[in-house]
A protein has these predicted regions:
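Alpha-helical transmembrane segments of integral membrane proteins
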Residues: 2-3, 89-128, 167-308
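N-terminal signal-anchor/signal peptide hydrophobic helix marking the start
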Residues: 6-16
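Transmembrane helix irregularities
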Residues: 30, 139-142, 243
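Membrane-interfacial helix-loop-helix junctions in multi-pass membrane proteins
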Residues: 53-61, 77-87, 165, 188, ...
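An internal, D/E-rich "acidic patch" concept
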Residues: 58-114
């Protein structure tokens, strides 16, 4: 088990190098001068050039990237061009808000997706099955930003029940959490149905039914337990994705999370903040995936033998 964890952690190194190189190249090629943005449009050219030299922006691409990697290894990701604060201080201040959205989104997706998926599987080809699959297809296909705008229009503009954005107590969490949860619930529903259908066709399920075991026991104890592995995979990936990719939702609702911080940094060509955000979110996503893989061993002990 420990060797497996060590291997996964070592594999993170080339992944992080590739991710940071790609993002660094994109920011390098993006039009705009960070020094000019910091000093303002009216700043003298001499002052801008002096700041560029001080920031090392006149160096070649690879020199700048290697300097970033060296500093990152030492734990120094620099300071934000716009606020002057250490970038990880900015990220840690906003990350709890992103976690709140991700956790609520996953709770909504599990609360809706697993029960609906089980019902669809046990009533295959019924009206309920067809209706739930149509809704799941709509949920998967629906753009996040469109759903977010429709919820704002309905509950904030028309009904006035919920705030349209920002962070102002529990009521402000509900719309973005629903926006995230709907898409994830659709994916969890489809995976639960598919996994349950595969399991309930197995011989041991037929045997349990032939012995007169109650249908609820067959479904909830025997079938669902063995169908959990792919469901856990999807839920884990959804949680990691919500932690690292709730950018659109946070932007639509002006939610003060890491995703919105990264969008603001991209607009302002705040390279240190963008790079630190990408590194942080990539690490979070990778760690969540590792934890999901390790969770398999507790659901199915047979998998423990593979973690060597």
């Amino acid at each position: 088990m420990y060797k497996y964890i060590l291997k996964r952690l070592i594999l993170l190194i080339p992944v992080m190098l590739g991710v940071t190189l790609l993002v660094f190249a994109i920011m390098y090629l993006t039009p705009g001068d960070p020094a000019q943005l910091i000093l303002g449009e009216s700043a003298p050219k001499a002052a801008v050039e002096a700041l560029r030299e001080k920031m090392g922006l006149n160096d070649s691409f690879f020199i700048q990237y290697l300097r970033f990697v060296k500093n990152a290894i030492m734990g120094d990701f620099g300071r934000s061009y716009t606020t002057g604060r250490e970038v990880f201080a900015e990220i840690f201040a906003r990350f709890p808000n992103t976690v709140v959205l991700a956790v609520l989104g996953v709770i909504i997706s599990i609360a809706i997706g697993i029960p609906v998926g089980i019902i669809s599987a046990t009533r295959q080809y019924s009206l309920m099955d067809s209706f739930s699959m149509v809704l799941a297809l709509l949920g998967v296909s629906m753009p996040v930003f469109w759903l977010g705008l429709m919820l704002i229009l309905a509950f904030s503009v028309k009904l006035g029940l919920l705030p349209s954005g920002g962070f102002d107590g529990l009521s402000s969490v509900i719309p973005p959490a629903i926006t995230l949860g709907v898409g994830s619930a659709a994916i969890v529903t489809r995976m639960t149905r598919s996994s349950m259908l595969e399991v309930i066709r197995q011989d041991y399920i037929r045997t349990a039914r032939a012995k007169g075991v109650a249908e609820k026991v067959v479904i909830n104890k025997h079938a669902l337990k063995n169908a959990l592995i792919p469901i856990i995979t999807v839920v884990g990936l959804q949680f990691g994705g919500l932690l690292g990719g709730a950018v659109l939702t946070e932007s639509v609702y002006s939610w003060p999370g890491v995703g919105r911080l990264m969008v603001e940094a991209i607009r302002q060509k705040d390279t240190p903040t963008v790079l630190a955000s990408v590194v942080f979110l990539a690490l979070v996503y990778s760690v969540v995936n590792l934890l999901v893989d390790l969770l398999y061993a507790f659901v199915d002990p047979r998998i423990k033998s593979q973690y060597k």
